Amino acid sequence: MESKALLLVVLGVWLQSLTAFRGGVAAADAGRDFSDIESKFALRTPEDTAEDTCHLIPGLADSVSNCHFNHSSKTFVVIHGWTVTGMYESWVPKLVAALYKREPDSNVIVVDWLYRAQQHYPVSAGYTKLVGNDVARFINWMEEEFNYPLDNVHLLGYSLGAHAAGVAGSLTNKKVNRITGLDPAGPNFEYAEAPSRLSPDDADFVDVLHTFTRGSPGRSIGIQKPVGHVDIYPNGGTFQPGCNIGEAIRVIAERGLGDVDQLVKCSHERSIHLFIDSLLNEENPSKAYRCNSKEAFEKGLCLSCRKNRCNNLGYEINKVRAKRSSKMYLKTRSQMPYKVFHYQVKIHFSGTEDGKQHNQAFEISLYGTVAESENIPFTLPEVSTNKTYSFLIYTEVDIGELLMMKLKWISDSYFSWPDWWSSPSFVIERIRVKAGETQKKVIFCAREKVSHLQKGKDSAVFVKCHDKSLKKSG
């Protein structure tokens, strides 16, 4: 807890100077003079994903042919975010390579606004309007000069770049097909009006990944509120597995706030790597589930795919446009491939135990036709007699069709005389499980008719019920 508190203090110091930067910008210029466009547009190739070797120059038609732009294919426009170094970050060529691997005949354009992006954050935040204006004028020129269909255009913006993409989409003559916001920046944009930030109106379809929304609104690195048609919050959107808070604090303590970018990079940049994962692992897309809150999701209450309640994360997302933004959640692994398998578990505790047990630790093991996943930890905030509890667990491997499960109640880490003298226990007759990825429901019965789950003792074993009446699921 102290580490988390220190992290928030550090971020607070870093963000304290951020004040709203109000820089107006006119609608995309319909004139033919493009000399004032400062952003550069590099068409990278599958052979050289790391270098800007050929630039498309608005107003110069020859530059488009010289770069071998494919007029019959999709175009991806990648817009980077704020930078401390003034150089491209390592994710840029990785995303370019993944896009080309998935769509070999496409055009992948990288927008260079590095000079504007390396200014003091509020200044760079204000520049997103100018960058968006540059991008819109470039797209409009391509459409007017070459009759290039904007239905083939997909903008991908990271951090501040997501808002630049939104501004661009709002200023094009026709709507572009899609904008993907990769953890859009929060400071200066959380309370901004739609014209100056990413919003659902900026493209035919807008999907957003939120991966670092830790902190109070307006001061979190990534924007917290939904800003697309579908907004996905992996691992609740606050912090990502594998991103070490303690290590980040140690780096800041040793090197100062100059390395604050290292603090935000892991979770903030995870949005990009999740999207890259969706490009490279198309056969096994991660599944996200619509839910009113991350708390409800953690209880396993949202693993439904009825009426578009679930969707694929990333490139193969289903373009669902509801009147209100859909907030969706999922769990992920700490590294690629990020896909996990979600399960809702419902257990009814009965017996003669008096009172409530608070913050109780358990372990559950699942055994299937393909593999097994053992000793998955979970904690129930409270446990009492004659109540049913629902919670979410997930496995990092596909275990196939569920066959058996074990449940263990972990003893407290501290010594307790009552537990030593007589361990509390509950009676469990059956456990209900729903698999999110397959939507299958299974009821498990105690192997010995009823199972006595005792704290700190052996696991209780449950097998699939054979009574047909039980398979009507609940």
UniProtKB/Swiss-Prot annotation:
GO molecular function terms listed in the Swiss-Prot or TrEMBL record: apolipoprotein binding; calcium ion binding; heparan sulfate proteoglycan binding; heparin binding; lipoprotein lipase activity; lipoprotein particle binding; phospholipase A1 activity; protein homodimerization activity
Keywords: Calcium, Cell membrane, Chylomicron, Disulfide bond, Extracellular matrix, Glycoprotein, Heparin-binding, Hydrolase, Lipid degradation, Lipid metabolism, Membrane, Metal-binding, Nitration, Secreted, Signal, VLDL
Region (Essential for determining substrate specificity): 243-266
Residues the record lists as binding Ca(2+): A194, R197, S199, D202
Disulfide bonds: C54-C67, C243-C266, C291-C310, C302-C305, C445-C465
Origin: domain of life: Eukaryota
Sites where a glycan is attached: N70, N386
Localization per Swiss-Prot or TrEMBL: Cell membrane; Secreted; Secreted, Extracellular space, Extracellular matrix
InterPro entries: AB_hydrolase_fold, Lipase, Lipase_LIPH, Lipase_N, Lipo_Lipase, PLAT/LH2_dom, PLAT/LH2_dom_sf, TAG_lipase
GO biological process: cellular response to fatty acid; cellular response to nutrient; cholesterol homeostasis; chylomicron remodeling; fatty acid biosynthetic process; fatty acid metabolic process; low-density lipoprotein particle mediated signaling; positive regulation of adipose tissue development
Membrane topology, record value: Peripheral membrane protein
One protein family per Pfam: PLAT
Description of the deletion phenotype: Mice are born at the expected Mendelian rate. At birth, mutant pups have threefold higher plasma triglyceride levels and sevenfold higher VLDL cholesterol levels relative to wild-type. After suckling they become progressively pale, then cyanotic, and die at about 18 hours after birth. At 18 hours after birth, their plasma triglyceride levels reach 15'090 mg/dl, compared to 188 mg/dl for wild-type. At the same time point, VLDL cholesterol levels reach 280 mg/dl in mutant pups, compared to 6 mg/dl in wild-type.
Activity regulation summary: The apolipoprotein APOC2 acts as a coactivator of LPL activity. Ca(2+) binding promotes protein stability and formation of the active homodimer. Interaction with GPIHBP1 protects LPL against inactivation by ANGPTL4.
UniProt PTM comment: Tyrosine nitration after lipopolysaccharide (LPS) challenge down-regulates the lipase activity. N-glycosylated.
Annotated transmembrane regions: none
Any GO CC annotation of this UniProt entry: catalytic complex
Signal peptide: 1-27
Active site: S159, D183, H268
Residues carrying 3'-nitrotyrosine: Y121, Y191, Y343
Tissue and organ expression note: Detected in white and brown adipose tissue and heart muscle, especially at the lumenal surface of capillaries. Detected on capillary endothelium in the lactating mammary gland. Detected in blood plasma (at protein level). Expressed in liver, epididymal fat, heart, psoas muscle, lactating mammary gland, adrenal, lung, and ovary. Highest levels in heart and adrenal gland.
Entry-linked NCBIfam families: lipo_lipase
Function comment: Key enzyme in triglyceride metabolism. Catalyzes the hydrolysis of triglycerides from circulating chylomicrons and very low density lipoproteins (VLDL), and thereby plays an important role in lipid clearance from the blood stream, lipid utilization and storage. Although it has both phospholipase and triglyceride lipase activities it is primarily a triglyceride lipase with low but detectable phospholipase activity. Mediates margination of triglyceride-rich lipoprotein particles in capillaries.
Homology family: Belongs to the AB hydrolase superfamily. Lipase family.
Name listed for the protein in its UniProt record: Lipoprotein lipase
Organism classification: Eukaryota, Metazoa, Chordata, Craniata, Vertebrata
